[in-house]
Amino acid sequence: MASGILVNVKEEVTCPICLELLTQPLSLDCGHSFCQACLTANHKKSMLDKGESSCPVCRISYQPENIRPNRHVANIVEKLREVKLSPEGQKVDHCARHGEKLLLFCQEDGKVICWLCERSQEHRGHHTFLTEEVAREYQVKLQAALEMLRQKQQEAEELEADIREEKASWKTQIQYDKTNVLADFEQLRDILDWEESNELQNLEKEEEDILKSLTKSETEMVQQTQSVRELISDLERRLQGSVMELLQGVDGVIKRMENVTLKKPETFPKNQRRVFRAPDLKGMLEVFRELTDVRRYWVDVTVAPNNISCAVISEDMRQVSSPKPQIIYGARGTRYQTFMNFNYCTGILGSQSITSGKHYWEVDVSKKSAWILGVCAGFQPDAMCNIEKNENYQPKYGYWVIGLEEGVKCSAFQDGSFHTPSAPFIVPLSVIICPDRVGVFLDYEACTVSFFNITNHGFLIYKFSHCSFSQPVFPYLNPRKCGVPMTLCSPSS
């Protein structure tokens, strides 16, 4: 009820020209009211067309000076603009401004309007259509837009998932890099500590040797000085004494004088000293990274006893040593050390047969003066071929090994030359620090066997390339005739 009254009031205060609520309403003598702007425009048009002004509704002429502002209507419009229909009174399909049913669609403004809106100044001249006519067209457009948005939503969700995945990946990678950096610098600190300790030990040894020599020279010089001083004292006494004292034993004194020679002390020029050079940290770090990489392929190697080898094996199958020699006596009681096995062989194979992939293991050879280790293609059926002779340690016979002799001579065994095929080509290896622990890396597909000096920060000792692995190969250890055992290290050691 209140809603209907309100609509009627709105119709009474609506401008007949623009069909909007009156703005600055002006009233004519006939009683009709118009917006100031609308009436002014109509007055100008009427004066041009007819030479007089008339009411747009009832056509009664009026004089401009008789136009008066309608305060009462202005107050009603002002109050009406403040009034809002209650939710119960509102109708979705009715115009909020005019209360008429919304049956038209303005194409230019994209709005649903009523017939009064269509005639208003706001929509005058626009293309309007019945809502039923354009609903299907816009439904198709909106459906297509909806499908497109759903597709974009799916793409956005996929991109969001990709970003989350990339974010997690980057976080993992950075954390991995942080761990590596910490490990690298920890290794560098260990290397620096080791180098510092080693260099200080060298300096202390140098100081000890030089001071010992200088002390010896100092003692000799003190003795020489004392001898010369005594001779001078004897001569002074003779010269100051009587003739008898002067000539008594003078020949001996003269001979002593002639025999006086000063032995110059041994000197140690500082400019000839060994110059300290800082370690190549970059090179050490590269070596450390290479060693870290190959250690990912560390396998737990043990040895396998066989009838050919006479090597002594520990219970855990990790430690290998040579047998103790037998003591025999000759016909005249002479003692001899010999090995009862005629086909003496201390070499032993690892229990793992390798036919593919990458494999790494480490061998502890500390305190040993002789050893051979590496990779072997297996023992030959003929035991005589396995007797320990250097000519057998050649790649063509299935041995890719390096060895140590006399505690200092480190060598690799390559195939002999065309002229001396029976003798291996022994490659002397320059090892700054004799290894106490050796790492062996076998890459079956790449046909390479590499040896690393774990004692010296993992520097590469030697590498066999283009190896002919035509059959399974095995880790190989040989303690030689040195009584100290060699031990296969576990990955956790």
Curated annotation (Swiss-Prot):
Any one GO CC term of the record: P-body
Region annotation Required for interaction with GABARAP and for autophagy: where it falls in the sequence: 185-198
Residue ranges occupied by any B30.2/SPRY domain in the UniProt entry: 281-493
Description of post-translational modifications: Degraded in a proteasome-independent fashion in the absence of viral infection but in a proteasome-dependent fashion following exposure to restriction sensitive virus.
EC number(s) from the headed UniProt entry: 2.3.2.27
Pathway: Protein modification; protein ubiquitination
Residues given in the record as Zn(2+) binding sites: C95, H98, C117, H123
Coiled coil: 131-240
Catalysed reaction, written as an equation: S-ubiquitinyl-[E2 ubiquitin-conjugating enzyme]-L-cysteine + [acceptor protein]-L-lysine = [E2 ubiquitin-conjugating enzyme]-L-cysteine + N(6)-ubiquitinyl-[acceptor protein]-L-lysine
Cellular localization per UniProt: Cytoplasm; Nucleus
Chain positions found as N-acetylalanine: A2
Record-linked Gene3D superfamilies: 2.60.120.920, Classic Zinc Finger, Zinc/RING finger domain, C3HC4 (zinc finger)
MF GO annotations: pattern recognition receptor activity; ubiquitin-protein transferase activity; zinc ion binding
BP terms from Gene Ontology: activation of innate immune response; autophagy; defense response to virus; innate immune response; positive regulation of canonical NF-kappaB signal transduction; positive regulation of MAPK cascade; positive regulation of NF-kappaB transcription factor activity; protein K63-linked ubiquitination
Modified residue annotations for Phosphoserine: S86
Zn-finger (B box-type) residues: 90-132
Assembly description: Can form homodimers and homotrimers. In addition to lower-order dimerization, also exhibits a higher-order multimerization and both low- and high-order multimerizations are essential for its restriction activity. Interacts with BTBD1 and BTBD2. Interacts with PSMC4, PSMC5, PSMD7 and HSPA8/HSC70. Interacts (via B30.2/SPRY domain) with HSPA1A/B. Interacts with PSMC2, MAP3K7/TAK1, TAB2 and TAB3. Interacts with SQSTM1. Interacts with TRIM6 and TRIM34. Interacts with ULK1 (phosphorylated form), GABARAP, GABARAPL1, GABARAPL2, MAP1LC3A, MAP1LC3C and BECN1.
Function as written in the Swiss-Prot or TrEMBL entry: Capsid-specific restriction factor that prevents infection from non-host-adapted retroviruses. Blocks viral replication early in the life cycle, after viral entry but before reverse transcription. In addition to acting as a capsid-specific restriction factor, also acts as a pattern recognition receptor that activates innate immune signaling in response to the retroviral capsid lattice.
Record text about domains: The B box-type zinc finger domain and the coiled-coil domain contribute to the higher and low order multimerization respectively which is essential for restriction activity. The coiled coil domain is important for higher order multimerization by promoting the initial dimerization.
Record-given protein name: Tripartite motif-containing protein 5
Organism of origin: Pan paniscus (Pygmy chimpanzee)
Chain's gene name: TRIM5
